[in-house]
Curated annotation (Swiss-Prot):
Transmembrane segments: none annotated. Its EC number is 3.4.21.88. The record marks A93, G94 as: Cleavage. It catalyses: Hydrolysis of Ala-|-Gly bond in repressor LexA. Keywords: Autocatalytic cleavage, DNA damage, DNA repair, DNA replication, DNA-binding, Hydrolase, Repressor, SOS response, Transcription, Transcription regulation. GO terms for biological process: DNA repair; DNA replication; negative regulation of DNA-templated transcription; proteolysis; SOS response. It comes from Staphylococcus aureus (strain Mu3 / ATCC 700698). This is LexA repressor. Represses a number of genes involved in the response to DNA damage (SOS response), including recA and lexA. In the presence of single-stranded DNA, RecA interacts with LexA causing an autocatalytic cleavage which disrupts the DNA-binding part of LexA, leading to derepression of the SOS regulon and eventually DNA repair.
Amino acid sequence: MRELTKRQSEIYNYIKQVVQMKGYPPSVREIGEAVGLASSSTVHGHLSRLEEKGYIRRDPTKPRAIEIVSDQTNDNINMEETIHVPVIGKVTAGVPITAVENIEEYFPLPEHLTSTHNSDIFILNVVGDSMIEAGILDGDKVIVRSQTIAENGDIIVAMTEEDEATVKRFYKEKNRYRLQPENSTMEPIYLDNVAVIGKVIGLYREM
């Protein structure tokens, strides 16, 4: 394989390090921040050189789709299979706001975090602190499996009677539904009707 420049080596080694730690590659922005490059076009240029020299492979149709090419000169790398999951608007964990019902981006997740059919999975960004006692914090990404039913105690994404989306713990009571926040300073939401969008099956948090 052709020799790398100092900057190309820095980028290549950073990509390998992130893959080894997280199981998936960094974004262009993260690469730039790590090696001190403010211009994303400059980072793209270095990635193109790495690809031309046979160190990486990329899929231009997907974000973060950088694959380390192994050969005799490279360390063995265990890169976990990733899937690209749609990120759909934002869901309020607090005062509900109307969810944006379109795909904002696709986010790569290690396959083990989904544990179900990939086509049924989507991600929502959490806004607010009503679920903090369940370990769901403002800015987290909740991994959601699409489904329209729920059992008491499930953490769900629901549409309220005002067509607003929210993350809460679900309870069906005698004549109503209770959407219970996991924050002792907040009151539950009581509804005559509630539409379950999906069940929260996982959580992703960037450290």
